Amino acid sequence: QNSGWFAWEPKLHRLTAFGTHPSTNPWGVTFDDWGQHVASYPIFASAHHALDPPYPEQHPRPSGLQAYSGVCGQEFIDFPNWPKELQGMMVKVRYKSTNRVELLRWKEYEYGYQEEYVSDIIFSTNLSFIPVDLRYGPGGAMYVCDWYNPVKGHAQYSLRDERRDRKSGRIWRIMPKEAKPVNPPKITGASLPQLLNLLKRPEYRYRYWAKREIREMKPITVKTALDEWVKNLDPNDPRHRHHQVEAMW
């Protein structure tokens, strides 16, 4: 078996394959605080750093991992309206054979990372609940995409199975109890200096959205402003190195 990911560069119309490994359907793509690509084995049900071994090498097949459910997506907790003790943890959706939204601890070791199950956020005995992706919204709530279908799988059931629901679908909004939405910064229509300063934000999604806006600007204008922004960074800032990494991205 041979599977992996594709990186699409819209302006160049270039598609690059990377991160191959001996498994199937490598779902669950996100990025950690330092921009490292994190994905999940759907069969072995564990997240890992999806690096890019030189062709034809692959990631080794996982061993000793708890293979109990397929995975569709994950997101790291980094919004301030979520409890302090949850910061840096991972929320993950599993779509079969369990139907749940989980909270996991992302633990770093000398030579890699490992996830540790903490608890369920949502668990349903209704098998029509099929969470397939999740993302933070600008107000700090987490949104889960629920396929909501009594039949799942293209191999297990006929494509013409009458029970297939082609119309329904739900979006779940998750917010910690008593938490209030955060005031999102202006991104669309913001000036270049404002967008660059958003790269200092601890919330990954704000940085991601800001970089999307910056990519639409003229490269020479961005480079001039970015060079000045990097030059004025405070080396005593605990996040100084992180800001430099954001500038490279």
Features from the language model and the residues they span:
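Beta-propeller blade termini and top-face loops
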Residues: Q1-P181, P185-N197, Y204, K211-W249
